[in-house]
Amino acid sequence: MRPSGRAADALRSISLTRHYTRHAEGSVLCAFGDTKVLCTASVLAKVPPHKKGSGEGWVTAEYGMLPRATHTRSDREAARGKQTGRTQEIQRLIGRAMRSVFDLAALGEYTLHLDCDVLQADGGTRTAAITGAFVAAHDAVATMLRDGLIAASPIRDHVAAVSVGMVDGVPVLDLDYAEDSNCDTDMNVVMTGSGGFVEVQGTAEGAPFSRADLDAMTRLAEAGIARLVQYQREALGLA
């Protein structure tokens, strides 16, 4: 029995609340159970140096956690003067995930800057950030289309992410903190709406996992992400 009482293949309660803040071109509060991430998308009329004059745009991301997003308070990274390696890894992952479904030429020389701020953490913050950031990005693109900044949507597909793991020899979907801190294997999977893999991050926390375990976790992630994409479509009014 999972601590939450969920079945092994069950997601937590998922919600995607659009237009959560006033100023950003796209904003979403994404909740995976008790994990809550505010995702905003800002349209910037500039591109990084490596894209200048290319006619292409860029999609990038930043990630952070509020000091009391976790059980005990942690200092703001700004107060420490630098980002942790974990933060850098996660924000690069979010950026790669978003770019995997964007036609940068269709975006023109604009940057879509995604900010993902963890308000409350209970496992799976990076997967919630990716899933919510896509919806925020979609709304930002809709704003660009409305304002005549671009002629056609640069979004080619959906993208979402979920965690899977082995807990007491059983593959489980969408781990919360209690499971994540005690699992045998922890894996994060990012996929597109059409079923393409963007990233698979898997680590054995104790004993190595088998190929059969890997296949079982991957199948579980595929099914979970298909449901997350459906949640995205419903939130965006596309279902």
UniProtKB/Swiss-Prot annotation:
GO biological process, one term: rRNA processing
Catalytic activity field: tRNA(n+1) + phosphate = tRNA(n) + a ribonucleoside 5'-diphosphate
Keyword presence, RNA-binding: yes
Keywords: Nucleotidyltransferase, RNA-binding, rRNA processing, Transferase, tRNA processing, tRNA-binding
Gene3D superfamilies, sorted: GHMP Kinase, N-terminal domain
InterPro entries, alphabetized: ExoRNase_PH_dom1, ExoRNase_PH_dom2, ExoRNase_PH_dom2_sf, PNPase/RNase_PH_dom_sf, Ribosomal_Su5_D2-typ_SF, RNase_PH, RNase_PH_bac-type, RNase_PH_CS
One GO MF term: tRNA nucleotidyltransferase activity
Binding-site residues for phosphate, renumbered to this chain: R86, G124, T125, R126
Record carries keyword Hydrolase: no
A Pfam family assignment: RNase_PH_C
Listed EC numbers: 2.7.7.56
Protein family per UniProt: Belongs to the RNase PH family.
Subunit relationships: Homohexameric ring arranged as a trimer of dimers.
Function: Phosphorolytic 3'-5' exoribonuclease that plays an important role in tRNA 3'-end maturation. Removes nucleotide residues following the 3'-CCA terminus of tRNAs; can also add nucleotides to the ends of RNA molecules by using nucleoside diphosphates as substrates, but this may not be physiologically important. Probably plays a role in initiation of 16S rRNA degradation (leading to ribosome degradation) during starvation.
The name this protein goes by in its record: Ribonuclease PH
Lineage start: Bacteria, Pseudomonadati, Pseudomonadota, Betaproteobacteria, Burkholderiales
Gene: rph
